[in-house]
Amino acid sequence: MKINSKDDIIDYFKDGFKEKLFIGVENEKFLIDNSSGKRINYKQTLDVLNFLKTFGWTEVKEKENLIGLSHNGKSITLEPGNQIELAGGLCKNIHEVCLESYNFQDQLNEACEKYNFKTISIGHDPSTKTNDVPSNPKERYKIMTSEMPKNGSLSLNMMYQT
């Protein structure tokens, strides 16, 4: 494209506009067992995921292992230390983002109440040592656990505690 005038510059940017823009948000929660004060293990995470299926979520499996859920363009995934992450759908505005987040939190709260767990929304788990974080059977996390330390001494901390 040749730019010969101010209008050419304006047209260049106008041509890049998209008609429909969306917002997509991810949020992650640590789940804590109220009885022990520790992060929940994979078996306990399965209880939560199976409970969430009552809200219309469908299973996502890797081999025979339940590793997440999906529903209407949204997904719930298990992170390396059994953190639960909602990858939201395409939202038109911040109000839809809030509604989606609140609905998910309400569902998660119901599951946690049933199993005596609580959610914590913080960026880093300050009370669990990396070696004590429970794991799950996702294949890529096994590979990442062995490979990531080659690139930094805190890589497993980032993976399991954030």
Please name every model-derived segment:
Residues 1-152, 161:
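Terminal catalytic/cofactor-binding subdomain
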